Amino acid sequence: MYRKVDVPFELYEVEILDASEEELAKISEEMGLALSVDEMKRIQDYFRQKGRNPYDIELQSLAQAWSEHCCYKSSKYYLRQYLLEASKADYVISAIEEDAGVVEFDDEYAYVTAFESHNHPSAIEPYGGAATGIGGILRDVLCMGAQPIALIDPLFFGNLDTPYEKLPRGTKHPLYLLKGVVAGIRDYGNRVGIPTVAGMVFFDNSYLTNCLVNVGCVGIVRKDRIIHSRAGGAGDLFVLAGGKTGRDGIHGVTFASAELDEKSEEEARGAVQLGNPIMKEPLIHACLEVVEKGLLTGMKDLGGGGLSCVIGEMALAAGFGAEVYLDKVPLKEEGMAPWEIWISESQERMMLTVRPEHIDEVLYIFQKWDVPATVVGKVIPEKITRIYYKGYKIYEMDTEFVTSGPEYCRPYVARKPEKELHEEVEPPADYVKTFMKMLSHPNAAFKEWIVRQYDHEVRASTVLKPLQGKMNFETHGDAAVIKPTRSFRGLAITADVNPWMCKVDPYWGAASSFDEMVRNLVAVNAVPHSFNDCLNFGNPEKPERMGEFVEAVKALGWMAKGVGVPCVSGNVSFYNETPYGAVAPTPSLLGVGIVEDVRKAITSEFKGRGAVILVGETHNEFGGSLYSAVMGQRCHKVPRTSPERLKTYSDAMLESFRKFEVKACHDVSMGGLAVCIAEMSFGRGLGFEAARELSFVELFSESNTRWVVEVPESVAEGYAEFFRAKELKAEVIGYSGGERLDFGAFSVELGEADKSWREGLTKFL
């Protein structure tokens, strides 16, 4: 089925014209294409029309372009139906269409956001997988002409107390993965000089055999310097800038488009890319300089699929084709076959399109920064991609055929609620013991061990940091705030999802995650402005898994349209599944808000001598809650929300910040009101005394659309009345100060609770 072509390098003709379905399946498996028989038959028909067999490089190119990772073949239909309408707003400059979303920041500047997954590589090699995830997301923002200003990293692992002897075969321990991933993010982000300001870490045994590493980036760009991921016109030159091309990252996207198993590490280690932050830093400077001087017509990063995807996509987006001279590509090693060069995903590479009259100046600037840059091709009028290698034509395909991957409307089964919504949840026999267990649970406990490894202050623009409060008393903040320009206008950044809620009910779990994202932005006095999603799910070929995805997407679209917060960019990561099961549905969200004046941003810790007010409504809703996890109770009613209620309360909260002096604000989320108040107390070592006995449901329910606000006692009643006048619920529930957490129903020493919370994660390290 493979015939070596008579050329002075490795090139094979693959005999598919008369191949049977069994032979097509065998070719796909042997070449690592990860294409179905139907997809191979479509390729077979194309080359029958051409009257020839394809070369190996052509089949490999199609495998990259048609992978789940690159063409979204299982998700496009449902994203278009339920979510893409939520990408529209007057202030959105570019959404969904390119590598990153571009949104108006002020009259002069726009901010750029991108959010991706690097799950499979991190499960195989946690340090390298996480590091190259950071490298890739930086390039997504850079290719829009933006200076990266902040990194975000939601991480998901199996339970840290998993006994080694109970690990499935071929699985790395969650503690090893956690340490490797955190080190990879730390070393890459710190060395390239971009602050890591937000994120989350979540532990659940659905991630035991398939951890998730999601990475996000925010950048800033002058509106007149925004550049797009497309060529300018025929005659433009393709310039490959950055790192050399090697055998690392080959079949990265096809590896990411299949389930993991116990053989994955042995078979797919070469699919993990190797990052180099020391090359990335000058590459960023050089790219921004040529953008500032107006020397480029287009720019795009080399991510999934490498050269095989970037050149065709840039050319076709402008209505043209490409001619490539593959032997001009700088290599890390000799002896690479043309197909390996074409699909390698080696890191730190950018593709630029440049008019011929500007090429010398562009190459000089990259030489000045000591970054390799080479002309590797040109844009041609025909919508065809041709590749030459050492004088031989080895590839010729219609660019539209390569980039028009399949699209499936996969069948799905929507999960039905397991029980009636009205369910009884047992209160704890011992309130204090239960509360201390909740505080020390790794999902609620202090994340200082992780946060302190990241430089969140480099670039000197981080106004609100991930940890807030008095030195040595810091607590978790709701969102970071960045001051990206000389004005006092700022960006608030948060990352949110609750996989436990999504596991119980994907629809209401996703809606609750959106609600929490908005709450976190509002809590720091930011107007919710846009969001990105990173949708992590199992095998889409299984109707139950596809049902989880569809329900989550429906919920996000409903919430986004109703609240008026557009989805500007995103990512879908399927096949997060092994023979031992799929990950919990995990629709990670990256939220961005506008802070009109960073000097008026609000932190989460109690300041003392204040009245504590609960804003919002509490219901008996324990599905996916920390309380139900700690107590081992199966609760099925995930907290409800609605875009109308969320919008009404959010607007009222922001108005109240303008009208009243507000000392502190924190959203009520994991652990409910009790854990929320405890976190606010820990930030300055100030206790809390309830004004009345708070009930079990009030303390531990995780109902949505709630905040705890600290105000001076003198304005407390006026503040609560402000909400009541709008027919919204607000109540003075207590006062800050003292050395105890006294909730009426129970009371604990603040120091004991603080110790339990701060040691909840570190006791496993």
From Swiss-Prot:
**Which residues hold Mg(2+) 1?**
E116, N571
Question: What is one GO biological process annotated to this record?
Answer: 'de novo' IMP biosynthetic process
Reaction(s) this enzyme catalyzes, per UniProt: N(2)-formyl-N(1)-(5-phospho-beta-D-ribosyl)glycinamide + L-glutamine + ATP + H2O = 2-formamido-N(1)-(5-O-phospho-beta-D-ribosyl)acetamidine + L-glutamate + ADP + phosphate + H(+)
Q: Indicate which residues the UniProt annotation says bind Mg(2+) 2.
A: D140, D301
Under Gene Ontology molecular function, one entry of this record is: phosphoribosylformylglycinamidine synthase activity
Highest taxon, organism lineage: Archaea
Q: Where in the cell is it found?
A: Cytoplasm
List the Gene3D superfamilies.
PurM-like C-terminal domain, PurM-like, N-terminal domain
The pathway to which it is assigned is: Purine metabolism; IMP biosynthesis via de novo pathway; 5-amino-1-(5-phospho-D-ribosyl)imidazole from N(2)-formyl-N(1)-(5-phospho-D-ribosyl)glycinamide: step 1/2
Amino acids binding substrate: S117, H118, N119, H120, R139, Q273, E345, S346, Q347, S573
Per the UniProt record, which EC number(s) apply here? 6.3.5.3
InterPro entries tied to this protein? PRibForGlyAmidine_synth_PurL (IPR010074), PurL_linker (IPR041609), PurM-like_C_dom (IPR010918), PurM-like_C_sf (IPR036676), PurM-like_N (IPR016188), PurM-like_N_sf (IPR036921)
Residues reported in the UniProt entry to bind ATP: Y72, D533, G570
Keywords per UniProt: ATP-binding, Cytoplasm, Ligase, Magnesium, Metal-binding, Nucleotide-binding, Purine biosynthesis
Q: What does this protein do?
A: Part of the phosphoribosylformylglycinamidine synthase complex involved in the purines biosynthetic pathway. Catalyzes the ATP-dependent conversion of formylglycinamide ribonucleotide (FGAR) and glutamine to yield formylglycinamidine ribonucleotide (FGAM) and glutamate. The FGAM synthase complex is composed of three subunits. PurQ produces an ammonia molecule by converting glutamine to glutamate. PurL transfers the ammonia molecule to FGAR to form FGAM in an ATP-dependent manner.
* Protein family (similarity comment): Belongs to the FGAMS family.
PANTHER family membership:
PHOSPHORIBOSYLFORMYLGLYCINAMIDINE SYNTHASE SUBUNIT PURL
Subunit arrangement?
A: Monomer. Part of the FGAM synthase complex composed of 1 PurL, 1 PurQ and 2 PurS subunits.
Output this protein's name: Phosphoribosylformylglycinamidine synthase subunit PurL
Q: State the species of origin.
A: Archaeoglobus fulgidus (strain ATCC 49558 / DSM 4304 / JCM 9628 / NBRC 100126 / VC-16)
Kindly list the organism's lineage. Archaea, Methanobacteriati, Methanobacteriota, Archaeoglobi, Archaeoglobales
